[in-house]
Amino acid sequence: MTELGTDLSVSSIKVAGIVVDMVDEIVHGAMLGKRGIATQIEDWCESGFVDHLFLLLLDKGFHVYLTADHGNVEAVGQGRPNQGLAPEIRGERVRTYRSETLATESAAANSNTYRIDLAGLPANFMPLFAAGRTAFLQQGEPAVVHGGISIEELIVPFVKVMRI
């Protein structure tokens, strides 16, 4: 934290983007679902790191905002499609294909999935989503995952941090 404070003291620095991936690490290592995640995040916050970081930034005159790149959802494995290298990206909630034929065949072979055309994606980028609260994991395996389009995965916080 001392080194960060020194780096932020340079008068030419007007904007700083700081990525703290601890919450993501906690989520990806989750064994006890969202309840366990909440407890681990609370324990981490009690370590003082977040308070020290916010105070350092505020003391240096920065406007501080807290956000996330995505949310998470508790899901249960519906099985992993056995496709070798067919999908371009193999996520827990979404698989993407470069071939319409492969995407269509995969959707037909996996009934608990759906396809949706999303504006802004390249024409040869075809996502196949796990439906409901399921994921492309071993059948019945519970996990906290992301990559789908549920409300919990899409809406993220954007909070201004201020002294009170």
Which positions does each model-derived feature cover?
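Feature captures the catalytic ectodomains and active-site-proximal regions of enzymes
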Residues: 1-164
